[in-house]
Amino acid sequence: MLKVTIIGVDLAKNVFQLHGATADGKVVFRKKLTRPLFERFMAGHHPCTVAMEASAGAHHWARKFTRYGYQVRLIAPHYVKPFLKRQKNDAADAEAIVEAALRPTMR
C-alpha cells in the first residue's frame, strides 16, 4: 500500500475535494467530502503535509490541521494555476495544488 505524504485540498463552502499522493506524485486517493466528513477524515488520518490555496478560509483550516499534527503549506493561487492539466474544476484544482506543493522551489 502506498503511503500518503501530501494531501491537496480544494476548499469550498460545502464540499471539499482532496487529492492524496506519495512523495513522488503517485495518486493514492481522490475524495469529495462534505464539511463534517472532511473534519472527521482529517482528524483520523496520519499526519502528513496538507497543501491548500491561500484564501480567507484556508487560514482557519491551517490552524486546525496544525493542531492535528499536519505540516501545512498555503500556496498563492497564481502559483497553482500553471499546474492545471485540464478544465478547471475542484478535482483538477486539488491535483494542481499537490503538483505545485511537490516542487522544491515552491514558496
Located regions from the model:
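Phosphate- and other anionic-substrate recognition elements at nucleic-acid/protein interfaces
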Residues: M1-R107
